[in-house]
Amino acid sequence: MESKALLKHSRVSPQKTRLLADQVRSKRIAEALRMLNLLGTKRARIIAKVLNSAVANAMNTGMMDVDNLYVKSIQIDEGPTMKRFRPRAQGKANRIIKRTSHIAVVLEEL
């Protein structure tokens, strides 16, 4: 049986977040959360938040043993981008792209 959690429009870069998600994939929940807490970055806190939400979903269904959960899949998709402009010299402007991410986590029991 699976437990899922989804976070949309998170203000972190999908490209950088995927590097962290690759480290967590296929690990047990306790080990994954321990690793994310040691990193302490914004991306790590956001992924840990989604993992904790998936664990809470598993507990609420009541059919899963929380100690035997592992990260079956974690998917980082690109959300909508926010476009901003930064003034430059001689009346010009550069475009700043602020990226967002959609994070989907699926946990499964061993």
Language-model regions: role of each:
Residues 81-99, 103:
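C-terminal structural segments of small proteins and small subunits
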